[in-house]
Amino acid sequence: MSRISVENVKHVAHLARLAITDQEAEKFQKQLDAIVTFAEQLNELDTTNVKPTTHVLTMRNVMREDVPEQGLPVEEVLKNAPDHKENQIRVPAVLE
């Protein structure tokens, strides 16, 4: 029995604002159902002696050292801004 229905696929497509045909919905339903079936096989593995991990590699937080540097002068930054006022860059309103 399928775990993913065509209606599920159409619903998710609608939520994602994607227009899909009935043929595409059926194709995606089969593909998604195969993926879910494969993922469920992982539940059958015995992981009793396996430590929980959050990453497959042993390296964590490999980052370079932070080195503070002098920033650009305000005048230099404002030269590249299309519009500015009182040392601040003006941008078009995003929210009304």
UniProtKB/Swiss-Prot annotation:
GO MF terms held by the record: asparaginyl-tRNA synthase (glutamine-hydrolyzing) activity; ATP binding; glutaminyl-tRNA synthase (glutamine-hydrolyzing) activity
SUPFAM superfamilies in alphabetical order: Glu-tRNAGln amidotransferase C subunit
EC number(s) from the headed UniProt entry: 6.3.5.-
Reactions accelerated catalytically: L-glutamyl-tRNA(Gln) + L-glutamine + ATP + H2O = L-glutaminyl-tRNA(Gln) + L-glutamate + ADP + phosphate + H(+); L-aspartyl-tRNA(Asn) + L-glutamine + ATP + H2O = L-asparaginyl-tRNA(Asn) + L-glutamate + ADP + phosphate + 2 H(+)
Keyword Flavoprotein carried by entry: no
Cell wall biogenesis/degradation found in the keyword field: no
GO BP annotations, alphabetical order: glutaminyl-tRNAGln biosynthesis via transamidation; regulation of translational fidelity; translation
Keyword terms of this UniProt record: ATP-binding, Ligase, Nucleotide-binding, Protein biosynthesis
A Pfam family it matches: GatC
Task of the protein: Allows the formation of correctly charged Asn-tRNA(Asn) or Gln-tRNA(Gln) through the transamidation of misacylated Asp-tRNA(Asn) or Glu-tRNA(Gln) in organisms which lack either or both of asparaginyl-tRNA or glutaminyl-tRNA synthetases. The reaction takes place in the presence of glutamine and ATP through an activated phospho-Asp-tRNA(Asn) or phospho-Glu-tRNA(Gln).
Family of this protein: Belongs to the GatC family.
Quaternary state and interactors: Heterotrimer of A, B and C subunits.
Descriptive protein name: Aspartyl/glutamyl-tRNA(Asn/Gln) amidotransferase subunit C
Species in which this protein is naturally found: Bacillus cytotoxicus (strain DSM 22905 / CIP 110041 / 391-98 / NVH 391-98)
